[in-house]
């Protein structure tokens, strides 16, 4: 395309691969940056250093993301594997600290995980006359962060509902470990009273709330999700999509689970909140299974990928892979050939009874 394009987006993968200029609106000011998203991170980090300590937390977050951008694919994979080996160390550190600083999103540690987290064996599941999952097996290790990817309607949310017991399996076995405490963020974000303020929804009107195993000021906790000052008094019924997503994250993460099921938590989130959520997951001593279309998020955070690889003949086929999204895509091309990287229409197989 030879013309100019102005795109409003929070998709960092798109910004890094397509954008030549980035214009950021920050606290009433417009800051132009020449270059892609990686260049933006470098330039903004320098600007925040000049602005001083008041932006120290943001500068640290940008520095962490920039270090990841500069690392090689091999370095990223090594870091992902190191996380899986560090569960005991991270859990012990969380128990020693028992303090949360909620200027940024932080996820409270849950109970210690045992040797079994989640084991799936030959899962079979259909819905509305269609076969969605057929023969899926995987084992989720402690400290694993799984990115679940695939087009809408292929069974990602249905899989979550089978894990939490809202949907029965048609076949196979799904074993949830005895030490697992589930926290689930519903894609539909239902059950929120539209007449309450968002602070009341999170706090039940209490000045102090229990966040995992830590008691803390409720307004400070709510502020960590981007709701500052008067924003906390907004009625829940008038919130935008991104605001409702942040509110639901706040509600769920305060439960203190050690296995998080996050159904498209990255939808409608701004870049700063996305980065804050990524850092929180990377520091979290526990497991997370995340349905998302955000490729940057999948590259930076995921230790495993659960990918829908349906075909015309087998539209209910899934593939379990250890590694991030970039590694998975290379593996997919090696296994299935160059055409595997191209998107194709979704087809479904009708359920049949033997």
Predicted regions and their residues:
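Intracellular alpha-helical coupling/juxtamembrane segments of multi-pass membrane proteins
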Residues: 43-84, 90-97
């Amino acid at each position: 395309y030879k013309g100019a394009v102005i795109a409003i987006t929070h998709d960092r993968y798109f910004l890094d691969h397509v954008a030549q200029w980035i214009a950021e609106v920050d606290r009433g000011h417009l800051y132009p940056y020449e270059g892609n998203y990686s260049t933006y991170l470098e330039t903004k980090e320098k600007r925040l250093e000049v602005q001083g300590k008041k932006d120290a937390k943001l500068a640290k977050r940008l520095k962490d993301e920039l270090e990841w951008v500069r690392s090689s694919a091999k370095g990223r994979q090594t870091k992902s594997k190191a996380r899986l080996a560090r569960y005991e160390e991270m859990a012990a550190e969380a128990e020693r600290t028992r303090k949360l600083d909620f200027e940024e999103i932080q996820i409270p540690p849950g109970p210690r995980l045992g040797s079994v987290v989640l084991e799936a064996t030959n899962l079979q599941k259909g819905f509305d006359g269609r076969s969605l999952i057929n023969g899926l097996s995987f084992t989720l290790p402690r400290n694993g962060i799984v990115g679940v990817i695939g087009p809408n309607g292929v069974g990602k949310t249905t899989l979550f509902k089978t894990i939490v017991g809202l949907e029965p399996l048609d076949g196979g076995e799904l074993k949830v470990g005895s030490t697992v405490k589930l926290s689930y963020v519903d894609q539909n974000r239902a059950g929120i009273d539209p007449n309450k303020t968002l602070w009341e929804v999170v706090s039940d009107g209490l000045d102090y709330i229990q966040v995992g195993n830590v008691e803390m000021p409720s307004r400070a906790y709510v502020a960590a999700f981007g709701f500052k000052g008067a924003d906390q008094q907004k009625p829940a019924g008038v919130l935008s999509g991104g605001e409702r997503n942040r509110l639901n994250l706040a509600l769920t993460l305060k439960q203190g689970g050690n296995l998080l099921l996050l159904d498209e938590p990255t939808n409608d989130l701004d870049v700063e909140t996305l980065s804050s959520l990524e850092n929180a997951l990377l520091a979290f001593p526990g497991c997370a299974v995340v349905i998302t279309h955000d490729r940057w998020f999948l590259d930076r955070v995921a230790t495993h990928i659960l990918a829908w690889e349906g075909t015309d003949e087998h539209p209910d086929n899934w593939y379990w892979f250890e590694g991030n999204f970039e590694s998975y895509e290379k593996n997919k091309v090696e296994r299935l050939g160059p055409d595997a990287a191209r998107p194709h229409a979704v087809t479904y197989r009708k359920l049949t009874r033997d």
